[in-house]
C-alpha cells in the first residue's frame, strides 16, 4: 500500500526457523520510495500470537473511505489466513503506525472460517466496492475463487465463485489456485477491463507453478467473469505469490516470490556444501500494462526504471 508517510509498504512471508518450524510463517514488513531500494521494518504480524497460528498470505486495505466505522480513517487493515487444526481461517488486524505493527480486529476471532478442516480456503484479497457500500473478498478455494461480501468487515456472505476447474477451462485445469488479486486496468485501446491474477500450476500445459491472469468483467455480485483463457504473467519457474499495487488506471506495479516448492523443500547449498541461510528472495519490480494485441488483451511487463529492451 502507499502510505501517508510517502513510502510504499510491502509484506512478505518470513520463516526464520524453517528447519525446525517448517510451517511457521509471519508477515515481514519492508518499505520503499523508488521500488529499487528497500528498507527492512521488522515483523509486522507475528506467528502464534493473538489466537492465530502461522500467518499466511493476505492483503491490506486502508480506511480512508471510513468503511470501518470503529477504526480511525488513518488505519490500515490486514486480512490474512492462518492454518489451525480446525481448518484454514481468515483473520483481520489493524495498524495505526503505517503498517509497522498490527492489533487484532474482531476480538482476535476469525472473520471467516474454512468450510472443513481439510478444505482449501486461503489468501484473501480485499477491495472496497464504494457503489454498493460493501467490502469484497476473493478467496482461493482449490479450483475456484470464492467471492464474499461484508457490510462491516467482520461478517461475510457468499456471493458466488469464479470456477477454474478442468471443465471451465476446456479440459485442462491449473491445479491448486492461490493468491488471487483483482485489478481494473485501462487497455491500450482505451477499453477498461478487469484483470484477475492468481497463482497456479501449469503442469497440464507443459509448464510449472507460476502467476497467471485472465481478462474479463464483473457481474452484478462482483464475481469475475472471464473473457479469455488463462495466460502466464511470467514464463519462468520462479515468479509466484505475486504482489500487485495499482499505480494508475493503466499501470500496476508487481513483484513476486523467487521460489518454487519443487526444489525448496530442502537445503540450498553452494559449491562448497555450505547451506544458505535463505531459501529464496523477492523479484525486481515491474510495471504491468494491458495491451490490445492480435485480437486479445495481454499483459506486458517492463522493469521499473529499467531499459525498455528488458520489456516482455
Describe each model-derived feature in a short phrase.
Residues 1-123, 128-173, 186-235, 258-311:
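Beta-rich carbohydrate-recognition and catalytic domains
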Residues 56-61, 179-182, 241:
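Signature of short aromatic-glycine-proline-rich micro-motifs recurring in repeat-based ectodomains
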Residues 187, 246-250:
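A short, structured loop/turn motif at beta-sheet edges
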Residues 236-246:
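Catalytic and ligand-binding motifs that coordinate phosphates/metal ions
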Amino acid at each position: 500500500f502507499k502510505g501517508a508517510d510517502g513510502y510504499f509498504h510491502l509484506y512478505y512471508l518470513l520463516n526464520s526457523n524453517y528447519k525446525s518450524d517448517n510451517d511457521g510463517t509471519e508477515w515481514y514488513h519492508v518499505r520503499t520510495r523508488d521500488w529499487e531500494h528497500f528498507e527492512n521494518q521488522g515483523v509486522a504480524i507475528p506467528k502464534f500470537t493473538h489466537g492465530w497460528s502461522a500467518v499466511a498470505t493476505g492483503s491490506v486495505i486502508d480506511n480512508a473511505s471510513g468503511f470501518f466505522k470503529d477504526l480511525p480513517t488513518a488505519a490500515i487493515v490486514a486480512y490474512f489466513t492462518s492454518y489451525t487444526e480446525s481448518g484454514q481461517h481468515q483473520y483481520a488486524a489493524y495498524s495505526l503506525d503505517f503498517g509497522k505493527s498490527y492489533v487484532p480486529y474482531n476480538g482476535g476471532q476469525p472473520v471467516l472460517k474454512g468450510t472443513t478442516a481439510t478444505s482449501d480456503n486461503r489468501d484473501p484479497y480485499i477491495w472496497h466496492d464504494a457503489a454498493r457500500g460493501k467490502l469484497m473478498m476473493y478467496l482461493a478455494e482449490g479450483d475456484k475463487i470464492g467471492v464474499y461480501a461484508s457490510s462491516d468487515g467482520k461478517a461475510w456472505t457468499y456471493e458466488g465463485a469464479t470456477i477454474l476447474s478442468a471443465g471451465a477451462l476446456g479440459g485442462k485445469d491449473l491445479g491448486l489456485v492461490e493468491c488471487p488479486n483483482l485489478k481494473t486496468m485501462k487497455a491500450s485501446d482505451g477499453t477498461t477491463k478487469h484483470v484477475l491474477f492468481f497463482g497456479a500450476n501449469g503442469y497440464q500445459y507443459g509448464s510449472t507453478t507460476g502467476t497467471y491472469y485472465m481478462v474479463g468483467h464483473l457481474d452484478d455480485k462482483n464475481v469475475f467473469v472471464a473473457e479469455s483463457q488463462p495466460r502466464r504473467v511470467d514464463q519462468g519457474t520462479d515468479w509466484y505469490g505475486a504482489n500487485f499495487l495499482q499505480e494508475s488506471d493503466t499501470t500496476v506495479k508487481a513483484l513476486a516470490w523467487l521460489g518454487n516448492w519443487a526444489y525448496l523443500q530442502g537445503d540450498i547449498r553452494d559449491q562448497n556444501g555450505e547451506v544458505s541461510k535463505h531459501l529464496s528472495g523477492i523479484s525486481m519490480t515491474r510495471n504491468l500494462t494491458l495491451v490490445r494485441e492480435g485480437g486479445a488483451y495481454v499483459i506486458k511487463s517492463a522493469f521499473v526504471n529499467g531499459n525498455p529492451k528488458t520489456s516482455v
